Amino acid sequence: MEKTRSKSKLKTVLIVLGIVVFAIALGIFVFLKQSFLKTFPELEGEPEIGKWYDIPVAGATSSDGSEWHGIFRKGTENKAVIYFFGGGVSITPETSEGGKEFYATSMLAQDFVAQGGVGSSAENNPFKDWSFIVIPYATGDFHAGTGIYEGKKTVYHTGYSNYSAYIEQIKPYVGEPDTLLVTGFSAGGFATSLLADDVIGRFPSAENVTVCVDSSLLLYDGWHDTAVYLWKTPTEISDRLTTDNLVLDSLTALHEKRGSSVKILFDCSYRDDTLMQYQSYIDNGKMDRTKELGDSFQRDLKEMVNGLRTNIPDVGIYIWCSGEDADTHNTQHTIISYNVFDKLGNDRSVGEWIFDAVNNDVKSYGLELLDKAF
């Protein structure tokens, strides 16, 4: 009798434990599906105002050959944000084959990112009622490639092909916007500089155009060759790359072509912890993050800012500090997808600074950080 009772108790305990484990697993799954693994519904018919959608694009691929889609939200205002996501880069055949070590290879978590920062529906977000055309990033080519790398594995550097097909597909839902903000973070910031002129040409009705590059500085003598031979970037884009500074080359060319009709902005934290790691790989073949690398990045950033202000006299600059490490003083990478409305010790947040520029009030903040010493 006692043995029967013991077995019954053990069975009950195991059932309870099983229920608890299942509940925890279910809770984790639900949390992930509502956050990191969130996916939007596919657009069917006319879009509902303020609702996010995934937009399947025929033939579009991520670098690993899996599906790629655009992300879209229709707003109430006749204004549009063209928003390039980031996530690393490939600059050589070796980094192409390295895949996830160097760049995002699939669409994992990209829907979730769209709702943060500048894309949020928060009341204090002046862009909350704009239409958003989001270009996710999973091709390792700064959204600028049309090529397929064939080595030990096949890698699709087809970011430009994806972007251009998606833009043409979604344009009928946007109409003819009178105001355009072209922006992107990290690799998407590099893409913003490379593709802003292309974007502007696709929306000729927009008379008020602002271009903002967030956290994009890497110095590399091989940018032109990478664009031509690895990514297979369209010639009109790769021809602009004549120095080791892709963003400076591209924004300078944009200003020379478009003049004062396009307001150009650049922001970056003054000791960007992620960019310095990639710069270390370019320079030394190894990613690293040290105080010395932070010092070097800070010097490079100062030179970059000086170049922008020389070549584009009316450029707006925002140098900021957030998430500073107590020992190395290295800082957060990118801001527009996250804490873009934090003041960061200035009169205006990065988000407000961008919106001010849209309204023809272009200013600069935080330049004193470029000379901060430790």
Model-found features: residue ranges?
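N-terminal Lys/Arg-rich, disordered targeting/topogenic segments
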Residues: 1-10
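C-terminal His-loop and adjacent cap/lid subdomain of alpha/beta-hydrolase
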Residues: 12-19, 24-183, 190-374
